[in-house]
Amino acid sequence: MLRAPGSDAPPTLSVRIAAAAGAACLADMITFPLDTAKVRLQIQGEGQGQPPRAPRYRGVLGTVATLARTEGLQKLYSGLPAGLQRQVGFASLRIGLYDSVREWLSPGQGAAASLGSRISAGVMTGGAAVFIGQPTEVVKVRLQAQSHLHGRKPRYTGTYNAYRIIATTEGLTGLWKGTTPNLMRNVIINCTELVTYDLMKEALVKNHLLADDLPCHFLSALVAGFCTTVLSSPVDVVKTRFVNSVPEQYTSVPNCAMTMLTKEGPLAFFKGFVPSFLRLGSWNVIMFVCFEQLKRELMKSGRTVDCAT
């Protein structure tokens, strides 16, 4: 990515990691209700040997309103602690390391990065982040998906209770359940999100359409969010279904995908598309805008400290 405006030196690795973690956590806190709505829409219609029922949730705003009315406003933020834990370890790596890995893969010092090196950087940083952050993803999805309606006893009472119960009843491997679809999803997301943002921002600045500032960051992030949602939705739905499933409901990730296809049709793979885009689009805008600003401010702070000493 291009260096922050007004900066003579590119952001250091520690600045990029800290800025990525902070920006991702802020974006998560603001958009989390949309993510919860997306999860509920994705698991709707998931049969467990029961006759089909009329949909409870209709559309993203309807889902948010239904959850707030029937389960309380706090339900919209169920799983947020795990979500923030996830971003600290996950986003800081996949976003914070992207520039460094891309530069390492580029042919020479100061040479323009090729599309291949950008994609490879997205694959490597996204894949590494998934293995580290998967337990937090499992807990987040489980807490978002569970309902307290109709006298159902919740599977988990809180974030750390969920970690303990999953590890106890399903083994440590239960905390890495769904790693394969999540790896596929996040490789797609990381490549599309970061590479699209990188290329869009570079094109806008180099062609003098926009300066490297807020409007450029906003537009680049919005385009990246839409492209990412289109490509990642099918894998995201399968990942959510598989991670949330009870033991032995699906024998494997392909079995989960085939069950969805045969019972619900191909459109099931795009369930929750609108909330996914609203969430990813808004998440991208908030995260990238904050990421750029945090990098700039952290570099300024570092230079101020250096001058003072």
Swiss-Prot record:
Has no constitutive proton transporter activity and has to be activated by long-chain fatty acids/LCFAs. Inhibited by purine nucleotides. Both purine nucleotides and LCFAs bind the cytosolic side of the transporter and directly compete to activate or inhibit it. Activated by noradrenaline and reactive oxygen species. Despite lacking canonical translational encoding for selenocysteine, a small pool of the protein has been observed to selectively incorporate selenocysteine at 'Cys-256'. The modification Cysteine sulfenic acid (-SOH) is found at residue 256. Solcar repeats lie at residues 11-104, 113-203, 212-297. GO terms for cellular component: mitochondrial inner membrane. It catalyses: H(+)(in) = H(+)(out). One of its GO terms (biological process) is proton transmembrane transport. It is a multi-pass membrane protein. Signal peptide: none annotated. Fatty acid 16:0 binds at residues 58, 271. Residues 33-75, 136-180, 235-268 are mitochondrial matrix. SUPFAM superfamilies: Mitochondrial carrier (SSF103506). Keywords: Ion channel, Ion transport, Membrane, Mitochondrion, Mitochondrion inner membrane, Oxidation, Repeat, Transmembrane, Transmembrane helix, Transport. GO terms for molecular function: cardiolipin binding; long-chain fatty acid binding; oxidative phosphorylation uncoupler activity; purine ribonucleotide binding. It is found in: Mitochondrion inner membrane. Residues 1-10, 99-118, 198-214, 292-309 are mitochondrial intermembrane. Its main location: mitochondrion. The chain crosses the membrane at residues 11-32, 76-98, 119-135, 181-197, 215-234, 269-291. May undergo sulfenylation upon cold exposure. May increase the sensitivity of UCP1 thermogenic function to the activation by noradrenaline probably through structural effects. May undergo ubiquitin-mediated proteasomal degradation. Belongs to the mitochondrial carrier (TC 2.A.29) family. Mitochondrial protein responsible for thermogenic respiration, a specialized capacity of brown adipose tissue and beige fat that participates in non-shivering adaptive thermogenesis to temperature and diet variations and more generally to the regulation of energy balance. Functions as a long-chain fatty acid/LCFA and proton symporter, simultaneously transporting one LCFA and one proton through the inner mitochondrial membrane. However, LCFAs remaining associated with the transporter via their hydrophobic tails, it results in an apparent transport of protons activated by LCFAs. Most probably functions as a monomer. Binds one purine nucleotide per monomer. However, has also been suggested to function as a homodimer or a homotetramer. Tightly associates with cardiolipin in the mitochondrion inner membrane; may stabilize and regulate its activity. This is Mitochondrial brown fat uncoupling protein 1.
